[in-house]
């Protein structure tokens, strides 16, 4: 009931706030001067972008001022604006609130560790945040004369002050609560509206389902092979699976178990139970009431008896497998839709092995999770929520095994590296070590970082007696979450080598080898610089000057490396236009294609780890050659993806993204995304289906209709979610097509049922929901089709009477 109340309340809040937010954003941009003022506001992308930058910073400040981090004043910004306006009224030579106050607050205050007495006299006591959010922005570097009129802030703060800003998810009756979850929806909606690129707001149930069924199976696989001791625990008769065998129904979701008891057959009404026997005669007559609505306590919302019986029988089947010890693979948790998060938590709590606890913690510290089209960070946010409790539970147990040298080293690192509290340290570790995202839209990446930072600040309370008000600096993740084109650029060293393999003579061959060696050395240097940059953030005694120098060095080296690779890619794809025309044509190509060189940006992952461990997301559903209805321009007219894409004939960006992800993922990685159902059904997507059959391993596909309810609110789109392993098991598990009502949304993903389906029966990836449907398909495929009995031409006459 509380969850439903929050859902209903937050839905109304998000719609109301978003409507006002859009108006405020449009109005705010009009007050900005000094950014391409000659361009009309509608087409002035940089001015619109800077309006977003400012609103993001100010919303972050609204959250932290309500927690007391801005001089202990919950109305800090509004009061400082009033002071500036009053002073300006008395002295016309005073500059605007933006120039006189905000720019200094951001650069010398929130982005600087030391504040002198003169600063504190004007600004009060505020924390050093770091995080990159208050660094000088690219637009601020490009445009030196930016100013914003005071009226922009008067209107904006009046709008913000109508709402209650807090960093938890409390439910109140005010209908005015703004928290990071609500803001996440608003950001997603805003980015999607701005991008007009076939992206939709992905709700938490989708991101959580995909996240838990990729991240946790990967962690289990890594832990199982971490040491001989732990490997024994994961053997079929080992401690891990014996724990599951003795667990009863603990790991079945409550929604699946609704109304289930071992003797449910005796408890259901007799006129329903009479239809259970499939061998006795008159089956249809005995099941006459199976289409009636199921009453409590057996029913889920909208369920009829036929559906209830199928669910209860499925519980019987799963329970039999658990108690017989037949489930001995982490992938079975996906197949039978068991609560793998609870299972992982229980194993950590119950294990008496220091090796198991340490290796679980070590796997958590090292897993790399990527969203290649991250938008405003919905999937990264879900990944953090999945990882955080496991981090905490492992750390809570480590102290019991501190005699183990590896455990002691891990504890020393933890004890040295956090001041605020353990949860803050965990979030910081996750954001720096585990999460990576790329998006073509710079605004989206900035919002993704903001959402992650808000999650961190939420777990810290202000402490006026402590240094920096008790707040550790936020992590700078400018090199974790990047802006660029996922589809264009060098993914790995193999792609660079392919472009260097077409030498015309021995001199060209030698030059190519020299280029390759130089690039390899530069990439290693960038990776080493990145490791040092990250290390400085994870140590407690972070030195500001040293940190800033490390960041500048990393950025400069990366810029140089990217420029070198982009020039090589431009020549490889467009040819060499000659010295005179090269630079203007190269810059034009650079501006339209925004190449992202994965092997340079994430060398330590692509080269050192063989790719990312987990890739999740919701790629854009956009036709490559289809013209946008609003702009009249097709993607292929803006940039061209390489001809090497095998999925190019599908002509859709989501197919290209999946193919790209298959290259970026490690040989033992997990891949999960939500995409249109057409991916597995249409002739136009055969190349993508071939990729699933030939290059991905064991796969689970669940499918959802657009009526009566939709996964993306208000969007009539039939969708599929796939989870794939990178292995040699070409097994496909599918569900039927789920048609569901909105009141069933809370139970939808907990009630999925998969069936193993042969995929050699037809070219497409067929979707079946039970063994009966599999049998029908097999019979259909094994018999001679009617078409073989039909002749294209015959000698018989046909007479027709009019």
Feature names for model-found ranges:
Residues 364-367, 432, 652, 719:
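Short coil/loop residues immediately preceding or within conserved phosphate-binding loops
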Residues 1-386, 434-444, 484-487, 566-627, ...:
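Preference for the N-terminal adenyl/adenosyl cofactor-binding alpha/beta module
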Residues 1-134, 202, 381, 388, ...:
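Signature of N6-adenine DNA methyltransferases within the class I
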Residues 69-71, 197, 221-226, 394-398, ...:
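Short, flexible/disordered secondary-structure transition segments
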Residues 234-247, 406-410, 690-691, 697:
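Long amphipathic alpha-helical scaffold regions
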Residues 389-393:
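Post-Walker A helix-loop "phosphate-sensing" segment adjacent to the P-loop in P-loop NTPases
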Residues 21, 213, 281-357, 402, ...:
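SAM-dependent nucleic-acid methyltransferase catalytic core
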